[in-house]
């Protein structure tokens, strides 16, 4: 059979990356080196498995498959259908729910779009939702807005009213939430967080939602791996809808899932007539064709693999150690007289206040980056600026994946404390007329012997732990 293109074209499409595009290949190798030689503490990050990488880089990405299994708008989808159905089955199994009571959409491309797809499925424009206030640990996609500006697009399409934590305890103020919900009458009550370290009282949230006739939507993006492993309580007993990303504690590819109830929603108190859930059709329609075209089939394939791994004893072992390591973070920071928001953690991360140390999260984040520690500045209750907030968020999943244990996390706290001391010292050395964040960063760029020594020490230490690639 003749090949009707040039030999150079054949080489173009068959050469490996290192030969075809050395520039991109070099950047990827540099990123692998950074991950291998860094302490990665960003709570929303993890390190996925070699098998998941294998599934991601396959010809499954070639196929267009608008629609759903058995109802596609293109031909040639018989194996794509098999894969999506397998992924859905594994999703239900991983979270210990059955297909008679729950369904799941695995096509959503990421967490924020998944949340928007649920809102659009269940609400008309300018209907109301309530979510946790962003500086109190909520997420942008739960309708965040300030007094002067709608930040999240969700708050432009729908009306949002936040609930908050008790400023004294750092715990969600359920009593005030209930009072406000009775007045506000939201269509959807969102129980989900991005920087809240305590367990949510799903039973109480369910009672509040029922009292005002709202859907209870749980966004478990951060904790879905812990839920799947059964090491923290599951929201599925109480929720109407559950959304999650797939790349955080679940340790899969970058994607999202939307779980929705099936069956009887309620029974009319007078007539005894059953009121059925009507979530599956509207949510599926909102995902496609409402917000997306063809799904990313390579991601769905990799997600199926991650979900299989999430049902193993080894995955539970991993999640148990995540919780232990997070507790070490809590204990060791307290020993050094740091204040933790909500006074600690029940999950995979801690939120550390730096106000009492005379420095902010942006400056500590920058120094940490210079010594090969990746964490993130984070708003804490009472903050006015998300760019220069009063805290840092520190998560255990990624370094636990690499095999670090409790003694290692105690050592990590020591490194972070030294970074805080360096940041405070540099900030105090700046003149009043030039002490803004850009001035601080410029001073850090000048370098110190201590920063260089710490960077080399961490670079060498982290090399001892395997990085799946």
UniProtKB/Swiss-Prot annotation:
Q: Report the residues modified as N6-(pyridoxal phosphate)lysine.
A: 248
Q: Which cellular compartments is it found in?
A: Cytoplasm
Q: What Gene3D superfamilies does UniProt report for this protein, alphabetically?
A: Aspartate Aminotransferase, domain 1, Type I PLP-dependent aspartate aminotransferase-like (Major domain)
RNA-binding: present as a keyword of the record? no
What's in the GO CC field? Answer: cytoplasm; mitochondrion
A Gene Ontology MF term for this entry? Answer: pyridoxal phosphate binding
Main localization of the protein described in the UniProt heading = cytoplasm
Mind listing the GO biological process terms from this record?
Answer: glycine biosynthetic process from serine; tetrahydrofolate interconversion; tetrahydrofolate metabolic process
One of its Pfam families is SHMT
Q: What is its EC number?
A: 2.1.2.1
Catalyzed reactions: (6R)-5,10-methylene-5,6,7,8-tetrahydrofolate + glycine + H2O = (6S)-5,6,7,8-tetrahydrofolate + L-serine
Q: In which pathway does it act?
A: One-carbon metabolism; tetrahydrofolate interconversion
The record's listing under CDD domains reads:
SHMT
Q: Which cofactor does it need?
A: pyridoxal 5'-phosphate
Keywords recorded for this protein, A-Z: Cytoplasm, One-carbon metabolism, Pyridoxal phosphate, Transferase
Q: Does the keyword Disulfide bond apply?
A: no
Q: Which PANTHER family match?
A: SERINE HYDROXYMETHYLTRANSFERASE, SERINE HYDROXYMETHYLTRANSFERASE, MITOCHONDRIAL
Describe its function. Interconversion of serine and glycine.
Q: Which family does it belong to?
A: Belongs to the SHMT family.
SUBUNIT field:
Homotetramer.
This protein's name: Serine hydroxymethyltransferase, cytosolic
**Native species:** Eremothecium gossypii (strain ATCC 10895 / CBS 109.51 / FGSC 9923 / NRRL Y-1056)
What is the organism lineage in this UniProt record?
A: Eukaryota, Fungi, Dikarya, Ascomycota, Saccharomycotina
């Amino acid at each position: 059979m003749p090949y009707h293109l040039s030999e150079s074209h054949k080489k173009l499409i068959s050469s490996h990356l290192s030969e075809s595009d050395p520039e991109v290949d070099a950047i990827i190798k540099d990123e692998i080196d950074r991950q291998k030689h860094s302490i990665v503490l960003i709570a929303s990050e993890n390190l996925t498995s070699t098998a998941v990488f294998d599934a991601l880089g396959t010809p499954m990405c070639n196929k267009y498959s608008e629609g759903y299994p058995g109802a596609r708008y293109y031909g040639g989808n018989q194996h794509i259908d098999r894969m999506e159905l397998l992924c859905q089955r594994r999703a239900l199994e991983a979270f210990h729910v059955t297909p008679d009571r729950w369904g799941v959409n695995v096509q959503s491309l990421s967490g924020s779009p998944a949340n928007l797809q649920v809102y659009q499925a269940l609400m008309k424009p300018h209907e109301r939702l309530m979510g946790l206030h962003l500086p109190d640990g909520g997420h942008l996609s739960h309708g965040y807005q300030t007094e002067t500006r709608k930040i999240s697009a969700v708050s432009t399409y729908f009306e949002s009213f936040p609930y908050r934590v008790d400023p004294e305890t750092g715990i969600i103020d359920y009593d005030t939430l209930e009072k406000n919900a009775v007045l506000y009458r939201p269509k959807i009550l969102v129980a989900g967080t991005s920087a809240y370290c305590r367990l949510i009282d799903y039973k109480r949230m369910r009672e509040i939602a029922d009292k005002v006739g709202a859907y209870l939507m749980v966004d478990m993006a951060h904790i879905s791996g812990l839920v799947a492993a059964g090491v923290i309580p599951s929201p599925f007993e109480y929720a109407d809808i559950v959304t999650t990303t797939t790349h955080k504690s679940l340790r899969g590819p970058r994607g999202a899932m939307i779980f929705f109830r099936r069956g009887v929603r309620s029974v009319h108190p007078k007539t005894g007539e059953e009121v059925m859930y009507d979530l599956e059709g509207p949510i599926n329609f909102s995902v496609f064709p409402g917000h997306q075209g063809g799904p990313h089939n390579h991601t769905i394939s990799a997600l199926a693999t991650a979900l299989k791994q999430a049902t193993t004893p080894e995955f539970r072992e991993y999640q148990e150690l995540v919780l232990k390591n997070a507790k070490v973070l809590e204990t060791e920071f307290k020993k050094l007289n740091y204040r933790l928001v909500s006074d600690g953690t029940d999950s995979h991360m801690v939120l550390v206040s730096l106000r009492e140390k005379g420095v902010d999260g942006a400056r500590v984040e920058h120094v940490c980056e210079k010594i090969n520690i990746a964490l993130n500045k984070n708003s804490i209750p009472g903050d006015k600026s998300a760019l220069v907030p009063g805290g840092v968020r520190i998560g255990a999943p990624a370094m636990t994946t690499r095999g670090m244990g409790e003694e290692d996390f105690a050592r990590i706290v020591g490194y972070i404390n030294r970074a805080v001391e360096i940041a405070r010292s540099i900030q105090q050395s700046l003149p009043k007329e030039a002490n803004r964040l850009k001035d601080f960063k410029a001073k850090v760029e000048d370098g110190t012997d201590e920063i260089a020594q710490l960077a080399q020490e961490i670079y060498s230490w982290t090399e001892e732990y395997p990085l799946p690639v």
